From Swiss-Prot:
<comment type="function">
    <text>The globular domain of the protein is located near the polypeptide exit tunnel on the outside of the subunit, while an extended beta-hairpin is found that lines the wall of the exit tunnel in the center of the 70S ribosome.</text>
</comment>
<keyword id="KW-0694">RNA-binding</keyword>
<dbReference type="InterPro" id="IPR047867">
    <property type="entry name" value="Ribosomal_uL22_bac/org-type"/>
</dbReference>
<keyword id="KW-0687">Ribonucleoprotein</keyword>
<keyword id="KW-0699">rRNA-binding</keyword>
<dbReference type="GO" id="GO:0006412">
    <property type="term" value="P:translation"/>
</dbReference>
<comment type="function">
    <text>This protein binds specifically to 23S rRNA; its binding is stimulated by other ribosomal proteins, e.g. L4, L17, and L20. It is important during the early stages of 50S assembly. It makes multiple contacts with different domains of the 23S rRNA in the assembled 50S subunit and ribosome.</text>
</comment>
<dbReference type="InterPro" id="IPR018260">
    <property type="entry name" value="Ribosomal_uL22_CS"/>
</dbReference>
<comment type="similarity">
    <text>Belongs to the universal ribosomal protein uL22 family.</text>
</comment>
<dbReference type="GO" id="GO:0019843">
    <property type="term" value="F:rRNA binding"/>
</dbReference>
<dbReference type="GO" id="GO:0003735">
    <property type="term" value="F:structural constituent of ribosome"/>
</dbReference>
<dbReference type="InterPro" id="IPR005727">
    <property type="entry name" value="Ribosomal_uL22_bac/chlpt-type"/>
</dbReference>
<dbReference type="InterPro" id="IPR036394">
    <property type="entry name" value="Ribosomal_uL22_sf"/>
</dbReference>
<dbReference type="InterPro" id="IPR001063">
    <property type="entry name" value="Ribosomal_uL22"/>
</dbReference>
<keyword id="KW-0689">Ribosomal protein</keyword>
<dbReference type="Pfam" id="PF00237">
    <property type="entry name" value="Ribosomal_L22"/>
</dbReference>
<dbReference type="GO" id="GO:0022625">
    <property type="term" value="C:cytosolic large ribosomal subunit"/>
</dbReference>
């Protein structure tokens, strides 16, 4: 059995999120939470929140034991890109892209 949680339209670029996501893939849930707690990246608290949600889904909906859970799959996909204008010289403007992410965490019980 596996449980899934998705964080949609998170205001961090997917490239930055993937750096942290790669650290917890395949790890035990408690170990993954410890890694996220001590990783000094802006994406760490957001990923920890999605991981906690996946653990809660597993324990509440599927009655799985949280001690036996591990991070089966985790990935970050590109979401919408908000576009903003930055005024420049002579009436021109440059485009600022504010990228967002969808973060998906799948936890499963180890056999």
């Amino acid at each position: 059995m596996e449980a899934k949680a998705i964080g949609k339209t998170i205001r961090i670029a997917p490239r930055k999120v993937r750096l942290v996501v790669d650290l917890i893939r395949g790890k035990n849930v408690k170990e993954a939470q410890a890694i996220l707690m001590f990783t000094p990246r802006g994406a760490s608290p957001v990923i920890a929140k999605v991981l906690d949600s996946a653990i809660a889904n597993a324990t509440h909906n599927l009655n799985l034991n949280p001690e036996n859970l591990f991070v089966k799959e985790v990935w970050a996909n590109e979401s919408i890109t908000m576009k903003r204008m930055l005024p420049r010289a002579k009436g021109s403007g440059h485009l600022i892209r504010k990228r967002t992410s969808h973060i998906t965490v799948v936890v499963a019980e180890r056999e």
